[in-house]
């Protein structure tokens, strides 16, 4: 009996020693994973809004491309002294552009974007044409007028919200839009910003 007890005791002591000699559990990367998630969260906080602005700017480019036929119509009509919106058929609305309209009196082109680009009420860009006051020695830029023949080449200036002065070079600043543009400057091309 003593022998059985000693063998049993020996086995228990041996098992306890084996447990004591086991290596301790390794360090787990749980804290490192939290740090990585925090870094990804911070990067995403900056990247996602920047990407959304990039998408809106690319959609504005579509509107400016659609306005090129309107610019051509205004230039043709200004050269002949006709109504500045004569013969122009606006393009069909797209997913990004609601309308492209010409003001028949001044030739200003208003591009209205859908809510995919900017919120309703803050989604128009205005293109303003101007011409030199005299063909031979211009001293200023003047707005186009319905029925008046224009002297010299037409210059176009783009206006977004916040731009309240012309940035055309000499012979002088061009006219301002009759209807203020409402598209936020962050979505507009550089030449449309203040």
Predicted segment positions?
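Long hydrophobic alpha-helices with heptad-repeat/coiled-coil character
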Residues: 2-13, 42-51, 127-130
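Periplasmic/extracellular, small/polar-rich flexible segments of pilin-like filament-forming proteins
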Residues: 2-3, 79-194
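N-terminal leader/signal peptides at the extreme start of proteins
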Residues: 1-32, 36
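Selective for proline/serine-rich intrinsically disordered segments
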Residues: 21-23, 27, 47, 127, ...
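N-terminal alpha-helical signal peptides/signal-anchor transmembrane segments
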Residues: 63-84
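N-terminal single-pass transmembrane signal-anchor helix
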Residues: 23-62, 66, 70
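Generic structural signal for short, solvent-exposed loop/turn connectors between secondary structure elements
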Residues: 28-43, 78-94
